[in-house]
Regions:
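PAPS-dependent sulfotransferase catalytic domain
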Residues: 46-56, 113-196
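Residue-level detector of alpha-helix boundaries and kinks
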Residues: 5, 65, 135-138, 168, ...
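Phosphate-binding glycine-rich loops and adjacent basic patches that engage nucleotide phosphates
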Residues: 14-21, 44, 107-116, 139-147, ...
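PAPS-dependent sulfotransferase catalytic core
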Residues: 1-72, 79-92, 96-130, 157
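The conserved 3'-phosphoadenosine-5'-phosphosulfate
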Residues: 151, 155-254
Length: 255
């Protein structure tokens, strides 16, 4: 790679970071490797300690995306700044109530949330979440404090280096083209490009509960680790996930 990764897509869970990443990946001037999409590098020590050359090895061009960078703002923002102080930051935001419900549904589906919605909120209020994964995934209330998280990025990057994208516009088909042209303009890339705005990151009830359990709660997927490259395992996992999702919605009691 000729230069450092220069674009980072950050934001709240379920706020459109993956969609922006996938749409940008269609552009011929942008390299957004699918195998490390949503890869926790700057905010997860185990990955960060592999070294920046490990991350850069996936890129021929200069764009990188991962969720939760904004939530772990101080840690990730500082590391991104130390890596590339001239980086451009795209921050994705969403109505915090809708975001919390969507995140809850997702973690129920992948078997990382077993409580009812009200029970999950109470556990967070009581301070019962301790591990990195719990703090990353199951903090439905804490994730809503966008102001503090944004201020952390403004501490390291100028306002001109930050562009905001709102989920409510991202899912509005009448605004998608304009939204992406604004993103391209922010990145100083030619805006006359027609994106394919296919549905991304579909959610729903798994078709096979057994397959879903094997994938998320057993060591079976890890058995392939010594034999299959990381990039292939990521693509295979994503494809299995897509094929096993039905159109039926997960119901949430918010009373």
């Amino acid at each position: 790679m000729n230069s450092r990764i220069n674009t980072f897509i950050v934001g709240a869970q379920k706020a459109g970071t993956t969609s922006i990443y996938d749409w940008l990946s269609q552009h011929p001037d942008i390299d957004a490797p699918q195998e490390i999409k949503d890869y926790h590098f700057f905010n997860y020590d185990e990955n960060f300690n592999k070294g920046i050359k490990y991350l850069e090895g996936f890129y021929k061009k200069n764009i990188h995306c991962a969720v939760n960078y904004m939530y772990f703002g101080e840690l990730s923002a500082k590391r991104i700044y130390n890596y590339n102080p001239d980086a451009k930051i795209i921050i994705c935001l969403r109505n915090p109530i809708n975001r919390a419900i969507s995140a809850y549904k997702y973690f129920v589906r992948i078997l990382k949330e077993t409580n009812s919605f009200s029970e999950a909120l109470q556990k967070e209020i009581n301070g019962e979440l301790k591990s990195f994964l719990e703090l990353s995934n199951n903090t439905y209330i804490e994730h809503r404090f966008y102001y503090d998280q944004i201020q952390t990025y403004l501490k390291y990057f100028s306002r001109e280096q930050i562009h905001f994208v709102f989920f409510e516009e991202l899912v509005d088909s009448s605004k998608q083209e304009s939204l992406m042209n604004d993103v391209l303009s922010f990145l100083n890339i030619q805006t006359e490009y027609h994106f394919s705005f296919q549905q991304l990151n579909a959610s729903g009830v798994p078709k096979s509960k057994l397959l879903n359990y094997i994938k998320h709660k057993t060591i079976f997927p890890k058995l392939f680790k010594p034999f299959l490259p990381f990039s292939y395992r990521r693509r295979l996992s994503k494809r299995i996930e897509e094929l096993n999702i039905s159109d039926k919605n997960i119901e949430v009691d918010v009373s």
